[in-house]
């Protein structure tokens, strides 16, 4: 029992030690336009968008059923994709990085402004992923 408590304590401490951030970039256009440019940038990296999550539509659709007010975001789309090369680098450095795959970029209306964003991972082993996400967003916002 004591070993389990110590293990859980260490796991909790490790989980809170590395905070990930979200990097946002303003976008002059619609979420549809931003999502198209993000998809084009992903394809430009030789990758495939595996799934597009229409989070804005889901929040709008379910708000009434939940007794919630207006959606906290306007239109919002999350594009999921993976890179075998980058994933292998990240997971060879730390196999636990499997938890971060697939990777995502998003476009959303937040506080009335369209933004493009992605997670920025704190772990050094995720540096190749951070570089890939930054390249994709840079290509979509240039």
Regions found by a protein language model. Name each.
Residues 13-16:
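N-terminal signal peptide c-region/cleavage motif recognized by signal peptidases
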Residues 115-142:
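C-terminal partner/receptor-binding element of secreted or periplasmic proteins
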Residues 101-123:
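Beta-strand/loop substructures that line and gate deep hydrophobic ligand-binding cavities in soluble
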């Amino acid at each position: 029992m004591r070993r389990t408590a110590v293990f859980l304590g260490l796991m909790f401490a490790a989980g809170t030690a590395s905070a990930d951030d979200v990097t946002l970039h303003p976008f002059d256009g619609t979420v549809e336009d931003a999502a198209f440019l993000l998809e084009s940038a992903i394809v430009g990296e030789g990758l495939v968008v595996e799934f597009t999550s229409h989070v804005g539509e889901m929040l709008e659709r379910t708000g009434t059923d939940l007794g919630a007010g207006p959606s906290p975001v306007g239109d919002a789309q999350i594009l999921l994709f993976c890179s075998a090369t980058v994933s292998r680098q990240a997971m060879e450095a730390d196999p636990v990085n499997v938890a971060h795959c697939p990777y995502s970029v998003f476009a959303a209306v937040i506080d009335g402004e369209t933004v493009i964003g992605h997670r920025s991972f704190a772990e050094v082993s995720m540096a190749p992923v951070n570089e890939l996400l930054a390249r994709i967003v840079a290509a979509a916002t240039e």
